[in-house]
Amino acid sequence: IDFAKAYADAKFHFDTFRTQGNELLEQAQDAFSESRNMRLAAQFSAQAMVYFYHTLYYVYHGLEFDSHDPVIMHDRMRTLSTKLMLAFDDTHIENIFTLPRLKSFLMKAPYGIRFDIAPQKLEIHMERVRKAGGIIENLCGLRLELYKELSERQ
């Protein structure tokens, strides 16, 4: 494996799509807090999560993800980190429906005339996306460090 190339490709992908995910998350927060536009906030949050998972997949595997479904993406990537696994897993106290909700946001927020969500629920989902984005950023950073270290040994 050419680790210098793997590092360069992964770093480019990381810088591009992590930035887009973070920008969408900021736009979601603005839509939520400034204009109270739940539809845009939901759509942008869900799309940010998709970008974060695409980034993680590419950094770890060097390939594009073949899905844009947050439920499938999480299921395939969750074993990379217990923190990531626990960010969306149910507890003995509550069932966490964030991933299925994000999936529905991707389809229903832009196109569904009857789309509606309580602001309190959306805020919880947005916070989980923010938390997962941070976890993914840290995981990618560790992987990029490994690629760089291995490329220096070649």
Predicted regions and their residues:
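Long, charged low-complexity segments
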Residues: 2-30, 57-154
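Short coil/turn linkers that connect adjacent helices within long alpha-helical scaffolds
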Residues: 34-35
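Short, hydrophobic, well-ordered secondary-structure elements
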Residues: 38-58
